[in-house]
């Protein structure tokens, strides 16, 4: 009986998986079954953390803006700033405000002071 050699498709699939897992440690980069499990786990984590990254960056921007705003005025906070921005229809998103807060605090102070003056003037005249 002559020997029949296997096809190349399964080997090609396994080498592709091994290339994906080449940076993993221990058996996770050597054994085929654990490579497939770790690949599934890695892709699942990557998909989950792409959404989580957006949430974390938004949280970071809010914390930065709030820290700078609270240094300026005791009674003024992030939520009041965002509310006043929407009332005045200024299109500054949180990312831009956080960049301004880090790079140039005086500019953010000027923006917040203008908004505070505008709201106080409207409240004084009775227009809201």
From Swiss-Prot:
Its main location: plastid. NCBIfam families: rplT_bact. The gene is rpl20. InterPro entries: Ribosomal_bL20, RIBOSOMAL_L20_CS, Ribosomal_protein_bL20_C. Pfam families: Ribosomal_L20. This is Large ribosomal subunit protein bL20c. GO terms for molecular function: rRNA binding; structural constituent of ribosome. It is found in: Plastid. Keywords: Plastid, Ribonucleoprotein, Ribosomal protein, RNA-binding, rRNA-binding. One of its GO terms (biological process) is translation. It comes from Lathraea clandestina (Purple toothwort). Signal peptide: none annotated. The lineage of its organism: Eukaryota, Viridiplantae, Streptophyta, Embryophyta, Tracheophyta. One of its GO terms (cellular component) is plastid. SUPFAM superfamilies: Ribosomal protein L20 (SSF74731).
């Amino acid at each position: 009986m002559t020997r029949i050699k296997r096809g190349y498709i399964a080997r090609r699939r396994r080498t592709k998986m091994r290339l994906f897992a080449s940076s993993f440690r221990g058996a996770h980069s050597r054994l085929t079954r654990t490579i497939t499990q770790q690949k599934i786990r890695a892709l699942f984590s990557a998909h989950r953390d792409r959404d989580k990254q957006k949430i974390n960056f938004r949280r970071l921007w809010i914390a930065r803006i709030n820290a700078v705003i609270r240094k300026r005025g005791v009674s003024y906070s992030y939520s009041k700033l965002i509310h006043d921005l929407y009332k005045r229809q200024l299109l500054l998103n949180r990312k831009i405000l956080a960049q301004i807060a880090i790079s140039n605090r005086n500019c953010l102070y000027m923006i917040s002071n203008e908004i505070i003056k505008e709201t106080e003037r409207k409240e004084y005249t009775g227009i809201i």
